[in-house]
Amino acid sequence: MNSNCQSLAEKSVSQPVCIVGLGLIGGSLLRRLTAAGYPAFGWNRSASTVQQAAADGMDVSGDLSATLQRAARENALIVMAVPLFALRDIVSQIAAHAPQCPLTDVVSVKVEVLRIVQEAGLAATYVGSHPMAGTENSGWGATDPALFENATWVVMTGGADDVTARVRDIAVAAGSVVVETDPVSHDGAVACISHVPHLVAEALSVAAVTESVGGGDTALRL
């Protein structure tokens, strides 16, 4: 490794990451970054999840205020890895305890998250993101440090350059391929992608019914 690459890697690893929410996505990211040598730490509401993560060697806590205060002291990139319905409460806690920290999230919709962040006065330090990865399982037991390998990680445009750089950095460290777009385009594309399997299944069902027994008009009404 040449000196420039080495110094860049050392700079990246030296930047702390605080992951709020240790389900499949947040927990997998914590495991991946910890294995890569990042000073990564996390929080989860569930005591059992905290215990499991700690038993696996992770730096975790069940005290959200203390975790966010630590993030503020260390200028950690805060990754909000909670469901959309829980996001507003988390954002309000970040505004109270770590308002200057760079901020991102991994929620699958971006326009609504941006609105919540703007209402809390945190837009200047926020860059949304969405790793296009997952499984049918959930919880700490389902976490996998290889979950993001070769997956697309979408990073939103329009944010501060320094925050964008840190979000891109963790995406690359997770093994993902970074794609940039704006929140509106992202949400439109994700909506289309999510509907494709249903549309294909419906088309195949209609074709099968029409070919085998006729009655295409009836099939289309179902």
What kind of feature is each model-predicted range?
Residues R45-S46, V107, G159:
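Residues in the short beta-alpha loop(s) of Rossmann-like NAD(P)-binding domains
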Residues C18-I19, M80, V155:
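Hydrophobic Val/Ile/Leu positions in short beta-strands of Rossmann-like dinucleotide-binding domains
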Residues P16, P39-F41, T125, T152, ...:
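Residues at the starts of beta-strands that form the adenosine-phosphate
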Residues N2-A72:
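NAD(P)+-binding Rossmann beta1-loop-alpha1 motif at the extreme N-terminus of oxidoreductases
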Residues Y38, M58, P99, G175-V177:
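Short phosphate-binding/catalytic loops that engage adenosine nucleotides
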Residues T67-P102:
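Rossmann-like NAD(P)-binding element
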Residues P145-L222:
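Internal alpha-helical scaffold of NAD(P)-dependent oxidoreductase catalytic cores
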Residues I90-G141:
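Rossmann-like NAD(P)(H) cofactor-binding subdomain of soluble oxidoreductases
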